[in-house]
Swiss-Prot record:
Keywords: Metal-binding, Mitochondrion, Oxidoreductase, Potassium, Transit peptide. The keyword Metal-binding applies. The lineage of its organism: Eukaryota, Fungi, Dikarya, Ascomycota, Pezizomycotina. It comes from the Eukaryota. InterPro entries: THDP-binding, Transketo_C/PFOR_II, Transketolase-like_Pyr-bd, Transketolase_C. Its cofactor is thiamine diphosphate. It is an enzyme of class 1 (oxidoreductase). Its EC number is 1.2.4.4. It comes from Chaetomium thermophilum (strain DSM 1495 / CBS 144.50 / IMI 039719). One of its GO terms (cellular component) is mitochondrial matrix. This is 2-oxoisovalerate dehydrogenase subunit beta, mitochondrial.
Length: 469
């Protein structure tokens, strides 16, 4: 039997409406000014985003065996050993394999973990150590966390993987009211979830949008009883993850997913730990302290090099590594020396890690009296991560740094024309004063349009405090 085809044609009335609508939109578009038409654009305005990061040459990674083994935090037995070139996910895989080999109480599980995981961090672990120690779970974060807490309470050392940090929220009740409080509830002689480690990828990648690019680390820093760790590279990832697994406190290890393949360095092949709760001074300076963690450190380093070259500003860069509990002593000592501090992170600015660091600095009398300028928080907008404009929702170090300094010619609507060297002295201050009003209006205008190109981590406060205070 032959099948008949029914063709539905639009009525004359519908066609008339469509033509009228198109005519109206065309007339409306032609009546708009070029500035108004930008509201309808699907493309963000031209902006000088962050200076390009060359992961192959950045000083934040150990590109040679000598550099990797010269780390003073490594034990002597490791410093006399060998290294292997690894990216971040390979270093995590190596740490997990080491933990499984050394301790039979270690279990690893999560969604697609037996398969190797979305980012391949658990590749071949199930084949090597067996499906009873490395296995998949149903798609239930609350169930994953509950199982992990129960296993830890029975003396195991479970490593639970949450596929994306964005997915952890159904498990939040388990983390807050069970994992973190177990020890307080049962007392010193009771059981605890101290052997628990939770891994999760976090941060933006350029196309993750609302449910795959969030940075919720500050939420975990409000939970007494947890340790929260964010590595910046493979050497750190291996050492900090092993320390977390061996720790007797429940730990949350948040891994910047954009670094899984981008960050590559020489990693010691033997087992080692890096200290939890201890920051690392990546670069010493005398004019201002920049405190950050994870992927934004690379953007900071690129911008700081440019700032030092153009203006002679000496910047001290600190990697927190553990954001809760964080290393107050290292940060305070640095700020007492420089008199200025900027805290940088990708997560939204409100109630973030930057707020805690800034408050702690001004609450410490010995540090506060040495401040030459207010502590600056430089972070993300308090908005969901957009898909099309995600790169503009991530930290833009260079653009806003140069703009706020008055180093860029500006269009009438506040967009940068070009970047140039700027004279110092009275002319510099005069131009800076004139441009500041334009830039403030530009920022408000950009925010209203939803084109958030003046985003996030910026080093304007660094240079302003150095030149103007």
């Amino acid at each position: 039997m032959k099948r008949s085809t029914v063709v539905i044609r639009p009525s004359a009335r519908a066609l008339s409406r469509q033509a009228s609508s198109q005519s109206f939109l065309l007339a409306r578009s032609s009546a708009l000014t070029s500035r108004q038409r930008r509201l309808y654009s699907t493309h963000p305005p031209n902006a000088r985003l962050n200076l390009p990061i060359d992961y192959a040459t950045t000083p934040l990674l150990a590109h040679t065996s000598q550099a990797a083994l010269s780390n003073p935090e490594l034990p002597a037995s490791v410093r006399n050993g060998t290294t292997k070139r690894m990216n971040l996910f390979q270093a995590i895989n190596d740490a997990l394999s080491t933990a499984l080999a050394e301790d039979e109480s270690v279990l690893i599980f999560g969604e697609d973990v037996a398969f190797g995981g979305v980012f391949r961090c658990t590749t071949k672990l199930a084949e090597t150590y067996g499906g009873d120690r490395v296995f998949n779970t149903p798609l239930t974060e609350q169930g994953i966390m509950g199982f992990a807490i129960g296993a830890a309470a029975e003396g195991m050392r479970p490593v639970a993987e949450i596929q994306f940090a964005d997915y952890v929220f159904p498990a939040f009740d388990q983390l807050v009211n069970e994992a973190a409080k177990f020890r307080y509830r049962d007392g010193a002689g009771g059981r605890s979830a101290g052997g628990l480690t939770v891994r999760m990828p976090c941060g933006g990648v350029g196309h993750g949008a609302l449910y795959h690019s969030q940075s919720p680390e500050a939420l975990f820093t409000h939970i007494p009883g947890l340790k929260v760790i964010i590595p910046r590279g493979p050497v750190q990832a291996k050492g900090l993850l092993l320390a977390a697994i061996r720790s007797n406190d429940p730990c949350v290890v948040m891994e910047p997913k954009i670094l899984y393949r981008a960050a590559v360095e020489q990693v010691p092949t033997t087992a080692y730990e890096l200290p939890l709760g201890k920051a690392e001074i990546l670069k010493e300076g005398k004019d201002v302290t920049v405190v950050s963690y994870g992927q934004p450190l690379y953007k900071c380093m690129a911008a700081l090099k440019a700032a030092e070259q153009d203006f002679g500003v000496s910047v001290e860069l600190i990697d927190l590594r553990t954001i809760y509990p964080w290393d107050k002593e290292t940060v305070f000592n640095s700020v007492r020396k420089t008199g200025r501090c900027v805290v940088v992170h990708e997560a939204m600015v409100n109630a973030g890690v930057g707020a805690e660091v800034a408050a702690a600095i001004q609450e410490d009398p010995e540090t506060f009296v040495r401040l030459e300028a207010p502590v600056a928080r430089i972070a993300g907008w308090s908005i969901p991560t957009p898909l099309v404009f995600e790169q503009f929702n991530l930290p833009d170090v260079t653009s806003k740094c140069y703009l706020t300094l008055g180093l860029a010619d500006v269009y009438a609507d506040g967009m940068p024309r070009d970047i140039r060297r700027h004279q110092k002295g009275d002319e510099f201050l005069r131009d800076l004063s004139m441009n500041s009003g334009i830039l403030k209006q530009s920022m408000l205008h950009s925010s209203r349009r939803g084109v958030d190109w003046l985003m996030g981590i910026v080093l304007d406060d660094i240079i302003l405090s150095v030149f103007l205070v």
